[in-house]
């Protein structure tokens, strides 16, 4: 998980990006780090995560994040046996628990990578 966080934390995304542009930037960062990934992985019925990198699920959110909604989404992902850890990539900070169902959860906040607070 730390190699994935390190790879994603190295990217510097332009401010004006669509969500799928952010997907591409994250995928490119994982490629550069030599980390294999899968895009839009179906974990269960009506449960599709943006990326899986090994057993780590990566969800990418652009714009304003509704904390209750994203936490529920992460709970659905964490309930899936193939997910052993979760990383949420957002433009803005959102409070997250350190674990969900005993699985580690980490936040990568792009505005911190930009060196500004949004």
Predicted features along the sequence, with ranges:
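Nucleic-acid nuclease catalytic cores
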Residues: 64, 68-69, 78-112
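Short glycine/proline-enriched coil/turn segments at helix->beta-strand junctions
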Residues: 31-35, 53-56, 80-84, 102-104
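Class I S-adenosyl-L-methionine-dependent methyltransferase catalytic core
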Residues: 17, 112-117
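Conserved catalytic cores of phosphodiester-cleaving nucleases, focusing on short active-site segments
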Residues: 51-64, 77
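Acidic-basic catalytic patches of nuclease active cores, encompassing PD-(D/E)XK
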Residues: 1-42
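Catalytic centers of nucleases
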Residues: 42-54
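Amphipathic coiled-coil/heptad-repeat helices and related helical stalk/stem segments
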Residues: 44-45, 70-73
